[in-house]
């Protein structure tokens, strides 16, 4: 079944929080890794917005996760 935009946003939000907490980073620290503000990171984690593709790829590389994992397509 194809996921709709809201489902993808929810899964991505959950994965961003999970990855950040696994690495024991604050929202401010994560933002600095990708040249974004704490406010931007908080917005992603609240599901209000999504990181742009380049930023998401940078986070995935830092966290050693695949893009499929970030989008909730693999465990």
Where in the sequence are the language-model features?
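Acidic active-site catalytic centers that drive phospho-/nucleotidyl reactions
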Residues: 20, 45, 68
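The alpha-helix within a helix-turn-helix
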Residues: 20, 31, 60
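DNA major-groove recognition helix of helix-turn-helix/homeodomain DNA-binding modules
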Residues: 54-69
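Helix-turn-helix DNA-binding elements, focusing on the entry/boundary residues of the two helices
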Residues: 16, 27, 38, 53-56
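A short, Lys/Arg-rich alpha-helix, primarily the initiator
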Residues: 1-22
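Short alpha-helical DNA-recognition segment
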Residues: 24-46
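DNA major-groove recognition helix of helix-turn-helix
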Residues: 45, 63, 71-74
């Amino acid at each position: 079944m194809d996921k709709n935009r809201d489902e993808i946003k929810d899964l991505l939000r959950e994965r961003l929080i999970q990855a950040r907490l696994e690495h024991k980073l604050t929202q401010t620290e994560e933002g600095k890794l990708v040249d974004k503000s704490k406010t931007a990171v908080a917005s992603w984690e609240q599901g209000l917005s999504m990181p742009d593709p380049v930023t998401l790829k940078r986070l995935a590389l830092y966290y050693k996760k695949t893009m499929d994992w970030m989008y909730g397509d693999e465990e």
